């Protein structure tokens, strides 16, 4: 009898355990409530908002998404209007004053009298000062991925990563790298071989990598950054024949992403958001403040390109230039000299001081060592360059030299506005918005995936959602 009771007791305990486990598994899990939903955020680098209404721009796929989905008149970008800061704003919902990405890398100050430099070989934790949307989603159990997205090197919260860094192949997640080599998308593990590819070829590889992940992993949140439009416009200028060709290439890659949704069987569960990091403007005159600084004894160069010593130095962002003073012992004297020089410099529209940085949503140099002491603003038709050698503080651009297209102008410049198109699951078809802000993108994506992004500067774009 005792043995029988013991067996019955063990059986009962086992049954209770199984029933309890089933009950737990059947309970709704708030963190995983929307894991059958997918959002893909795509940036076409340098695709200005004005291209959507430009009849010369061959954007058949993008315009189809706009007709079938929701669009904005334009999207204001963050200062500085360059690639890495704005891609970071898109995934954090905050401006550079908070996320701290001010360049396409980290601004390094080696010490008094030594030139500053921008280092792009940095990991995500060294670059981004706040949590990202993909951090939050990954922690909630969502599958995450990025292809050529800035500031993602060694991001532990991306399940698949092909980061936007100089040595992309070395810093890919190993599983993805191995799969892409087997699939013939990558030729091998040599960074140098990949680095010399044209931007058009790289865009094809990045898109193929994205479609591979979509079909194999079905990520809940994917980031894809395409580059060919930016590199082409820098050389040939915006709204040039070459720029239109680059846009056609980007549009073709966008169509391939759509086809991959069908192959993966997730089109009806997917939302696409297509935007850009900045627009583009033509500038045919280049300002070289470092040349003026060298002539004034504030900077020294060597025979080879580069700066040997600098008490004052600019780092160009394109339409603005960041001014750094490296020696605290001569700061006041050097700043006075630079202000006098730049007030007389051709092509300078304004000189901004730290008390004006808050309005730009840029950090205070007193609390952020990457931030400049002054910002130079270019006049229309001008842009900045880091060149320190030569005799001319202003040079003219020719087609042979290239460098006709620029960004990095203040975000109030209308041509810096990016497009915004939302399409697919959860999007209100036909919704039309005015001018929005890029900080609105991350909280809106969070809502689409059943999450709330705490601490965002932006708002949820409820006007574009079927169920706000």
Question: Model-predicted segments: where are they?
Answer:
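Sec/Tat signal peptide C-region and signal peptidase I cleavage site
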Residues: 29-33
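Short, structured active-site-proximal loop/turn typified by the sulfatase FGly-forming signature C/S-X-P-X-R
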Residues: 50-98, 145
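A long, amphipathic alpha-helix that forms part
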Residues: 50, 200-224, 229-270, 336, ...
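Bacterial N-terminal signal peptides
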Residues: 14-28
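His/Asp/Glu-rich, glycine-adjacent segments
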Residues: 95-237, 332, 343, 385
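Metal-dependent active-site segment of extracytoplasmic phospho-/sulfohydrolases and closely related
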Residues: 41, 61, 249-293, 445
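N-terminal secretory signal peptides that target proteins for export/translocation
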Residues: 1-12
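Active-site neighborhoods of enzymes that stabilize oxyanions during catalysis
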Residues: 130, 308-432, 436-444
């Amino acid at each position: 009898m005792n043995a029988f009771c013991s067996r019955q007791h063990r059986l009962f305990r086992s049954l209770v355990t199984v029933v309890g486990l089933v009950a737990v598994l059947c309970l709704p899990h708030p963190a995983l409530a929307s894991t059958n939903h997918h959002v893909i955020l795509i940036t076409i680098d340098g695709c200005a908002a004005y291209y959507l209404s430009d009849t010369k721009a061959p954007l058949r796929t993008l315009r189809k998404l706009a007709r079938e989905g929701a669009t904005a008149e334009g999207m204001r970008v963050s200062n500085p209007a360059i690639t890495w800061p704005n891609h970071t704003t898109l995934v954090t919902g905050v401006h550079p004053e908070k996320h701290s990405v001010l360049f396409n890398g980290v601004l390094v100050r080696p010490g008094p009298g030594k030139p500053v430099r921008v280092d792009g070989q940095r990991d995500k934790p060294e670059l981004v000062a706040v949590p990202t949307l993909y951090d939050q989603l990954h922690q909630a159990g969502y599958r995450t991925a990025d292809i050529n997205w800035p500031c993602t090197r060694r991001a532990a919260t991306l399940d698949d990563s092909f980061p936007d860094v100089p040595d992309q192949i070395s810093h890919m997640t190993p599983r993805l790298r191995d799969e892409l080599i087997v699939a013939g998308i990558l030729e091998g593990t040599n960074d140098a071989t990949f680095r010399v590819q044209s931007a058009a070829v790289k865009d094809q590889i990045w898109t193929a990598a994205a479609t591979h992940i979509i079909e194999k992993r079905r990520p809940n949140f994917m980031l894809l950054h395409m580059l060919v439009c930016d590199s082409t416009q820098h050389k040939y200028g915006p709204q040039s024949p070459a720029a239109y060709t680059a846009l056609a290439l980007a549009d073709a890659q966008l169509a391939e992403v759509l086809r991959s949704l069908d192959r993966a069987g997730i089109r009806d569960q997917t939302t696409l958001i297509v935007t850009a990091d900045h627009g583009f403007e033509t500038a045919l005159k280049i300002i070289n403040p470092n040349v003026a600084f060298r002539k004034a004894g504030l900077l020294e160069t060597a025979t080879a390109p580069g700066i040997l010593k600098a008490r004052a130095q600019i780092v160009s962002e394109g339409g603005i230039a960041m001014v750094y003073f490296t020696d605290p012992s001569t700061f006041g004297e050097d700043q006075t000299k630079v202000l006098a020089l730049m007030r007389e410099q051709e092509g300078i529209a304004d000189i901004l001081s730290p008390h004006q940085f808050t309005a730009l949503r840029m950090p205070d140099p007193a609390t952020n060592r990457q931030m400049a002491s002054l910002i130079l603003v270019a006049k229309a038709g001008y842009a900045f360059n880091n060149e320190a050698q030569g005799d001319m503080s202003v040079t003219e651009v020719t087609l042979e030299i290239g460098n006709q297209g620029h960004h990095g102008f203040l975000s109030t410049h209308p041509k810096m506005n990016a497009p915004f198109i939302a399409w697919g699951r959860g999007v209100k078809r036909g919704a039309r918005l005015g001018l929005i802000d890029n900080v609105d993108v991350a909280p809106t994506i969070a809502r689409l995936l059943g999450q709330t992004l705490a601490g965002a500067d932006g708002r949820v774009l409820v006007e574009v959602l079927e169920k706000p």
